[in-house]
């Protein structure tokens, strides 16, 4: 019997192709992928950063779908990974008489960031429709003198239709480890489960359907004064925003949470914070990507 679910995988290997003359300093990549993954044309900014949008051609996930994504960021590389559209998770609970409790769709992501490299992984939002079941896992390994920026934006249900997650479940697990000379050290661990209960609870989402996380892991020797400056800039962004935001200081980086009713507000907020992170790191100002929603401009 033919399988009705997707099992797709994508493997990306990035490396710096700086020539001996030093004139051509940019990050290039090799890839291997299966449906429903597809890679759009990459582009480069003034720093030679490889900007690669990833497309999910199936239009969404249903129960039983499994996606596996792996990226290796080689030495002296700069990479911006994003997606060309929001990831949609369709309802699974109650759809089958054989399996009425539904089946989780899942995505597993594994990333390795080698010396003096910088990865920005900024996928568009994940929309979990009513009764959708979705699980995602991220396993990140990063060297001492590299950095990692990650955003994760979740919307529960279609608010315009009065829909919430109902009997659905969203689960997320993020593990970031620092590759040491003698042993690996835990840098950051985060586990989240969102259900109808957490959506409605006063101590949870309080009926606000949009939840987002921005995690920034910097180099181990990154100046504390620059982190303090960045925190003050982020607090100014918070004051200009009418949503619920929190800022946490990590051993080497920052953790930011967003809770509100508008995905657009979340994207704009995270873009402003991203701009400030680029500034304190001495990188060029980020540009709005053509695959992102035009209404945010």
Curated annotation (Swiss-Prot):
Pfam families cross-referenced by the UniProt entry: UreD
Localisation: Cytoplasm
Keyword Cytoplasm assigned: yes
One example GO MF annotation: nickel cation binding
Keyword set includes NAD: no
GO CC aspect terms: cytoplasm
Source species, domain of life: Bacteria
Keywords linked to the UniProt accession: Chaperone, Cytoplasm, Nickel insertion
Protein purpose: Required for maturation of urease via the functional incorporation of the urease nickel metallocenter.
Family: Belongs to the UreD family.
Subunit text: UreD, UreF and UreG form a complex that acts as a GTP-hydrolysis-dependent molecular chaperone, activating the urease apoprotein by helping to assemble the nickel containing metallocenter of UreC. The UreE protein probably delivers the nickel.
Name under which the protein is recorded: Urease accessory protein UreD
Organism: Prochlorococcus marinus subsp. pastoris (strain CCMP1986 / NIES-2087 / MED4)
